[in-house]
Regions:
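C-terminal nucleotide
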Residues: 16-177
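Gly/Ser-rich oxyanion-binding loop with an adjacent helix/lid
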Residues: 1-23
Length: 177
């Protein structure tokens, strides 16, 4: 557990990060601009009765410890593995809710498949995660920016709504207001 953590406000943790993570990009592929069929608030309520929620909570605790260790050690492969498993897990729970729902779109799945193929072929640490909707976040170190952004433009934008994506990167952390 991170010291001085809070469920109420953001707590800076950047001083614990391995320097490689300070250079990370988080480019967001906008697969759909449509309103989600199930809001995040409604999705959280559906978790209350999800038969797999307790298992999920236990799994998340273990993965959080692994993630913190990966972030401290600069273990990009472990970071990416956990990141992607969490994305799959979240959307799997949505499909197992009562009633079940699916926020992924065909473009989401196509992008995921392309990212797996790109990583396997190029040996570049490009990983994805998913927000609570169809959009895909691509995370990678700045060292690979040119190659990854060319891949986005040449291979992935066709799956984005109106070719929309938001190039972004790690910021300076939370600031007290």
């Amino acid at each position: 557990e991170a010291q001085d953590s809070s469920d109420l406000y953001a707590v800076g943790w950047g001083h614990h990060l391995h320097p490689i993570f300070a250079t990370f990009h988080d480019d967001i592929l906008i697969i759909s601009k449509e309103e989600k069929g199930v809001s995040s608030t409604a999705g959280h309520k559906l978790m209350d009765d999800n038969p797999y929620s307790e298992t999920r909570y236990m799994t998340v605790q273990g993965r959080m410890k692994q993630m913190l260790a990966a972030l401290k050690a600069g273990d990009i492969e472990l970071f990416g593995d956990i990141l992607e498993k969490e994305a799959y897990s979240l959307h799997g729970l949505m499909m197992l809710s009562n009633p079940p729902y699916l926020l992924l779109r065909p473009g989401t799945v196509s992008v995921i498949e392309k990212v797996h193929e790109f990583r396997r072929t190029n040996k570049i640490p490009l990983y994805f995660t998913l927000d609570a909707g169809p959009n895909v976040h691509l995370l990678y170190p700045d060292l690979h920016k040119e190659v990854v952004q060319a891949f986005i433009k040449n291979e992935l934008l066709r799956y984005c709504s109106e070719g929309s994506y938001i190039p972004d990167k790690v910021g300076n952390g939370p600031k007290q207001l």
